[in-house]
Amino acid sequence: MLTLSDFDFDLPPELIAQTALPERSASRLLEVDNTNPSAPPRLIDRRFAELPACVAPGDLLVFNDTKVLKARFFGRKASGGKIEVLIERVTGERTALAQIRASKSPPPGTTLTLADAFDVTVGERVEPFFTLHFPDNCLVLIERHGRLPLPPYIEHAPDAADETRYQTVFAANPGAVAAPTAGLHFDDAVLAALEARGVERATLTLHVGAGTFQPVRVENLAEHRMHSESYELTDALVEKIAATRARGGRVIAVGTTSMRALEAAARDAQAAGRPLAATRAETDIFITPGYRFRVVDRLVTNFHLPKSTLLMLVSAFAGIETIRAAYRHAIDARYRFFSYGDAMLLTRRDDAAEATHGGA
């Protein structure tokens, strides 16, 4: 049985990208050709701008169109004590769930002043979050007064460049507290080249939660509990997936968030004995080696943290040894890692179930 230690690796800290490159599609792309099960994977170093040459007319790229909220606030209690608030999810026009860092957990009814701009009232606890009641439309107040919640491994304070580059060019639906980072490499030129090549596009929405950065704290992966995130698939997306299948094209997920939404919806549909359909739901799907993929044929993704659930996901998709070889190559070739880093293009290995944990 696989354990957490099976997904550890040594990463030189200087390979953690701290800023975005001047041009989105100037990032590197490691194409991993693992289609021959009797041979080692072929690792091809490219620029991301070459992606259109790596996909075929009739393929379908599925993007996550979530938009990152300016979800981080610094503030104070009425007593003057300092607090830090990270909005996890907007739940209504004037309500949200949030993490609160303070010397002592604020009880219901506590008033907090955020960004020296407005007050919120603490409501009921919804573990591990607090309900916050805003005085006005919370999306407006968050956008006006909040700070971009850069990942914990990015060491600088967010600036004007981050406000552009930590969003995808197709971000449309506010609600995430972390970017769907595989999408950050796409610029208008790459999207136009994909269209010219006859590659279809579709979108879904999965609002990435702060739990995406939470470490796995148990060695036995069966004991890990994933955070829950909300997602939505539309009729238009489902129809495009069916049309792609009918013409022999491949479904290519842009990012692990798109992957998780597609696979969660397909798994739940299969369990209910129905075909994939438009849906709005929550998912805490945890994809590990042994999982049987139902929708996605290829995956565009960044390089992930050691011992992370996302590293487990890509290992399930492409094969553990394939991913280990690709990561060794990426480190040796000085690829940039994590949110502002470079990308990989993976193909599903139907024999990737090198271990049986994960099933379903």
UniProtKB/Swiss-Prot annotation:
| UniProt pathway | tRNA modification; tRNA-queuosine biosynthesis
Q: Which residues form a coiled coil?
A: none
GO CC terms of this entry: cytoplasm
Keywords of the record, alphabetical order, are: Cytoplasm, Queuosine biosynthesis, S-adenosyl-L-methionine, Transferase
- Biological processes per GO annotation: queuosine biosynthetic process; tRNA wobble guanine modification
Name the predominant localization: cytoplasm
Q: Extract the Gene3D superfamilies matched here.
A: QueA-like
Supply one GO molecular-function term.
S-adenosylmethionine:tRNA ribosyltransferase-isomerase activity
Q: What is its EC number?
A: 2.4.99.17
Q: Which InterPro entries match?
A: QueA (IPR003699), QueA_dom1 (IPR042118), QueA_dom2 (IPR042119), QueA_sf (IPR036100)
* Record's subcellular location: Cytoplasm
Q: Name one Pfam family in it.
A: Queuosine_synth
Q: Does the keyword Zinc apply?
A: no
Q: Record's HAMAP family?
A: QueA (MF_00113)
Its job: Transfers and isomerizes the ribose moiety from AdoMet to the 7-aminomethyl group of 7-deazaguanine (preQ1-tRNA) to give epoxyqueuosine (oQ-tRNA).
Q: How does it assemble?
A: Monomer.
Q: Its family?
A: Belongs to the QueA family.
The name this protein carries in UniProt is S-adenosylmethionine:tRNA ribosyltransferase-isomerase
Q: What organism is recorded for this protein? A: Burkholderia mallei (strain SAVP1)
Which taxonomic lineage is given here? Bacteria, Pseudomonadati, Pseudomonadota, Betaproteobacteria, Burkholderiales
